[in-house]
Amino acid sequence: MTYNNPVIPGFNPDPSIVRVGEDFYLITSTFEYFPGIPIYHSRDLIQWTLIGHALTRTSQLQVHTPEPGGGVWAPTIRYHGGIFYIMAASFQRYRPQQDDRVWPQGFYVKTMDIWNEETWSDPIFFDQVGFDQDVSFNFLDEDGTIYLSSTYRKIHPTPGDELKDFAIHICTVDLATGHSTSEPQLIRESLSGVAEGSHIIKRGRYWYLFTAEGGTEGGHSEWVHRSEVGPLGLWELGPNNPLWRNGVEDEVQNTGHADLVEDSKGNWWAVLLGVRPTRQGNTWEDSVLGNGRETFLVTLEWKNDWPVINGGQKISLISQGPGLYQFETTVAWRDDFSESRMQLGWYRKNTPFVNDYSLTERPGRLRLYGGPYNLSVPACPTMFLRKQIHRVCRWETKLSFHPISNQTEAGTVLWLNYFTYSSIGIRKDDQGRFIRFQPSEGDATEYRLNDQTDITLMIDCGTKYRFGYCAGTGDDVHWIGSVSNGAAMKVPPVGAIFIGMMTGLYALGERQRCLVPADFAYAEFK
């Protein structure tokens, strides 16, 4: 049966998956955004529902002023003895342009009730540094030993080559304390200079080591190794590495970072990341959705005790697998702010210091009290973001904002990072209120508002991003500017683009708090 890929569109990279009974649970990276690590649920591998996040409290996650691409990387989810475990790491400093990184200490959180996000524990930190942590519980069942694998730079660089030298290391750990109980050993390095995303499983008499190699851009690929001895190796390279290879001219690119799951019928599957660029004439345009890397699903078969993923073929947008079916995620989504808590799927940039919003002070409105940081500051602004998951759609909100200071603003934003964003909002000067459109490149433009009505703000998404507003019921849309998709995806001068495009709501003051609230009546994609 054929089905559509990606199965979880938009900014959802580095998938990790586990099955408990008939239920599948999948998690992805969140980088510098809060809450951290979304948890998706499915019973058929096709329709996935966001059911919560693993890191929702300041006692679990403190992400403050990291560069774009910092924060929480590539978590792994596992289940053992009635307990769900999630392993991850959080970069507080990430400046690859200067080869300046602080290797984070990994950690894990756990719960017995994955449906209640408040039950996840505070983190237990590992002694071992690195990223892409994985703990396999296969070995706990055999001799009580737990192995932790992670990625960091080799102690001794490769002589004569300018490589990243990111390699897979493994050590034993005391899970209760996180303390290492053995020295780490290097078990896999790559000629590309990057071996990461390690997952170790046991099947039959073999242990299998899966690694993502070549970096997460055009050279990305997935490799496999096996050992009859144990997780320390020796490791035998698979006969058909990489397990598949998508190139820079394919409809799906940058594929890799796979994790495996077996369904209740004995079928095996792999989830992995990929991007969907759009063809524009003779060139590819970076995907506003998939540059953040999306979650794909493909079949896995075992032949001669080696895994064969997707039949060894390239990953495509239409895939085949037993028992699956065609499904398209709907464009329409709306939040009327009618509940006492924010809907799942809203994100903050960084961990907020204070409570700067309310859903109860004015029922049926999201009330924001803008904090002292504008959107260009690395700190956490008063801003709520949602992932764009369809290339062609319209984002819309209705705003009531009557500022008393010339140094405050509220509106809606097209967001990539604090270097690259485009906003349309309400401000005031001595003559009254006006609309300001600030594109990601170029100068701001302003349009006078003649009355005190609520303002509808919108962003049309497609071949470009177009920004407009309506003043009052029945007013025509005033389209006041646009931003090319290329400009919206501009690479930052520091950090990296690991996320896809997001849209959001904000209120801000220039080094001061907004004393007047901004009230949003709704937010929607349509």
Where are these regions (language model features)?
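Carbohydrate-active catalytic/glycan-binding domains of CAZyme proteins
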Residues: 1-526
